[in-house]
C-alpha cells in the first residue's frame, strides 16, 4: 500500500470516527472520488458544478466536468481502449483577465455564440437531484458521452 493510500485511508477513518468535515482540494479525480461525499468542480476560480459524489461521477452536467471525467484512467485496459476521451482545445484563459460570460466558453465544445459568450450562466439545478447544480446554459444530457455527443449542438439551438 502506498503512503498516499495510507494517508487517505487514515483521513477517511478519522472522518468516520470523529464526524469530521474536510475541504479537500485535488486534481486527481480518483482520489477525490475515494475521499469525498460531495464534490465541487472549479474552472478559473469559479464553481461550475456541485453535487454528491455518486451523482457527479455518474451524471455530470457541466462540459468541463465531463471532459475531466473522460480523462480519468480506468483499470480495465479493454474499457480504456474503447472509451472516448474528450480533448479540450485551445489555451486556458488568463485567470487574471477571464473571459466574459461563461469562463469556459472559449474551450467548450458545446459553445453557442451569442449566449455563452454574452450571458453568464447561473449555478442552478440543471436536471437531476435538487442538490446537483451546474453553471452551464447547455448542460450534458447523458453520460458517458462520445466525442460526437459532446460536440453536438444543444437541442433547440
Model-inferred region functions:
Residues 3-81:
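P-loop NTP-binding/switch modules centered on Walker-like glycine-rich loops
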Residues 52-157:
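Charged, flexible cofactor/metal-binding loops and thiol motifs
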